[in-house]
A protein has these predicted regions:
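Membrane-proximal transmembrane or re-entrant/amphipathic helices at the cytosolic face
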Residues: 2, 465-506
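Transmembrane helical elements of multi-pass membrane transporters/channels
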Residues: 13-28, 196-211, 215, 235-307, ...
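Signature of the first transmembrane helix
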Residues: 5-67, 95-106, 127-129, 163-164, ...
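Interhelical loop/hinge segments that connect adjacent transmembrane helices in multipass membrane
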Residues: 1-10, 180-193, 197, 209-261, ...
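Transmembrane-helix boundary and interhelical linker motifs in polytopic inner-membrane proteins
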Residues: 3-8, 36-44, 58-92, 111, ...
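Specific pore-lining/lateral-gate transmembrane helices of multi-pass inner-membrane transport
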Residues: 75-91, 283-395
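Alpha-helical transmembrane segments of multi-pass membrane proteins
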Residues: 57-58, 93, 97, 101, ...
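Hydrophobic alpha-helical transmembrane segments
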Residues: 124, 154-221, 396-402, 415-436, ...
Length: 506
């Protein structure tokens, strides 16, 4: 299969998975203005930011690399995909259930340690949510493996829709109708931020129930079209051992990787005193969310790219396809980065004005997402060569960098250092992964074009910030016009250099 055709397949799958991811993330993004405008204090949003940072870390621990392991072994010769699927399901269910039970039993000491001694129910609710999400990662991976993008997208969007509706119900509708007997009997307006977690667990439970048909499918015998000549069992200790040997290094990688993403929101409260800790975290967390468009794009690309890489890694022209994917990922990432920065004066209205003081972190976070996405693209050299320990090494280096920057500089410059820690961390491990990876798997990246687009992006940003710094008589709308012209220039250069040739490919 030619590289051009592979790029079209990747683009199609990215569009399908990306639509659900982008729409879902965007709709969830709309909860940010709801929280910042409706929750009574900035510290309330700080609680949301802090606890969801913890849940993100715990979710990676509870999946312990099995999602990627499933893709690797489901595509492996001599193994029945259904056996791999069943083994993954049973294993994840067992560990997730155990985690939820233990957290419920020890909710009080956990709540004390995290600084929420009067809200042990927050711990129990989120533990159950994390357990269900960890288990659901395998059925969702199975849907991606079997190329069933529509059910995947529908179930992802179902959760988002339910979560938004329930948040609106608890935070907006109920306060206005709590005098009704049917509402007043159970609704407590002072519970406030707690209803964010109640909405989450209800939406997650419904989504998990809807996954049941695909979970049951894993325990059905395959027909002749599904590798029926291979031995199929519901569970295999041998396969589990192989998967764990492959996936456990990915656990270290994943834990360190998610720590690089969430340590800022986990550690930040420890650098401030009293109530100011959650207030500063609330401001930081809200402004961090403004940059989520870049994360949406990276996530959409990941959904399509991971199964694409493992399925195509034996093709002779696969390395050419990987190089093209990297190039166009970077081009479109720069496009999003420029658009977000040039229109930040408009985007800032998605959060309440009391949070605007933190908008200076947005460009830094955008660059961090760009470096993170490039690092993700580079990471397949050690996944395809079964040298996943390198991913763990890079991630551990990243954690050390992240912690060092935050400990040294947050007390001096505040949450700006938290944002910088992510950008610097991903830039360093991105460079390390490229330098070491080319010794193990040769991929002909178009470094010349990537370098040119990087210089163009930096130059356009330099012009924009130079004008903003030197001209004091223009208002924000004039600068948005300037940004529009600069953005259009990038599009024109992209079209003339690459896009018109890409569109002509057959």
């Amino acid at each position: 299969m030619s590289s051009n055709l592979q790029m079209k397949i990747l683009a199609k799958e990215t569009a399908i998975y990306g639509m659900s991811s982008i729409i879902g993330k965007f709709l969830n993004w709309l909860l940010v203005p709801l929280y910042t405008y409706v929750l009574q204090q900035q510290s309330d949003y700080g609680i949301v930011t802090n606890l969801y940072a913890w849940t993100a870390l715990l979710l990676v621990i509870l999946t312990y690399g099995m999602e990627t392991g499933f893709f690797r072994f489901a595509n492996k010769e001599g193994l029945h995909p259904k056996t791999v699927y069943g083994t993954s399901l049973i294993t994840l269910f067992s560990t997730s259930a155990l985690f939820a039970i233990l957290c419920a039993i020890y909710s009080q000491p956990i709540a004390n340690a995290l600084g929420y001694p009067t809200h042990t129910e927050f711990i129990t609710l989120l533990a159950i949510v994390v357990a269900m999400d960890a288990f659901a990662s395998i059925p969702f991976a199975y849907l991606r493996y079997t190329k069933r993008a529509l059910p995947f997208a529908a179930l992802k969007l179902l959760f988002v829709f339910l979560n938004i509706v329930l948040n609106l119900f608890f935070l907006v509708i109920c306060p206005t109708i709590q005098e009704w007997a049917i509402i007043g009997a159970w609704y407590n307006a002072s519970y406030g931020v707690g209803y964010v977690f109640v909405a989450n667990i209800i939406a997650t439970a419904i989504q998990t129930v809807c996954l049941l048909p695909y979970i049951i499918e894993g325990f059905k015998k395959s027909d002749t079209r599904e590798a029926s000549t291979l031995p199929q069992t519901y569970f295999s200790w041998d396969i589990l051992k192989q998967m764990l040997r492959y996936s456990l290094p990915l656990l270290v990688l994943g834990v360190c990787g998610i720590m690089n993403q969430t340590l800022d929101r986990i550690l930040l409260p420890f650098f401030y005193q009293g109530a100011d800790a959650q207030t500063q975290l609330g401001i930081y967390g809200a402004c961090f969310k403004v940059a989520m468009v870049m994360m949406m794009f990276t996530q959409a690309f990941r959904y399509a790219y991971e199964p694409f890489v493992f399925a195509k890694h034996k093709d002779k022209q696969s390395v050419e396809a990987y190089a093209d994917a990297m190039k166009y990922y970077i081009i479109f990432s720069y496009m999003i980065l420029l658009g977000m920065i040039f229109y930040l004066d408009l985007l800032k209205f998605i959060i309440a004005p009391s949070y605007w003081e933190g908008l200076k972190i947005v460009p830094i976070v955008l660059w961090a997402y760009v470096f993170q996405g490039v690092y993700f693209n580079l990471s397949f050299w050690y996944k395809l060569t079964d040298k996943t320990q390198w991913g763990a090494y890079f991630s551990m280096i990243g954690v050390v960098i992240t912690i060092a920057i935050q400990v040294l500089f947050v007390p001096r410059i505040g949450y700006i250092a938290s944002a910088l820690s992510g950008a610097i961390c991903y830039f360093i491990i991105m460079v390390l992964s490229y330098l070491i990876g080319r010794k193990h798997l040769t991929i002909p990246y178009d470094l010349k074009s990537i370098g040119i687009y990087t210089l163009i992006t930096v130059a356009l940003l330099g012009i924009y910030y130079l004008l903003k710094g030197c001209i004091t008589g223009w208002n924000e709308y004039i600068f948005m016009i300037v940004g529009t012209l600069l953005f259009a220039l990038y599009i024109v250069l992209f079209y003339r250099k690459d896009l018109r040739f890409l569109l002509k490919r057959k």
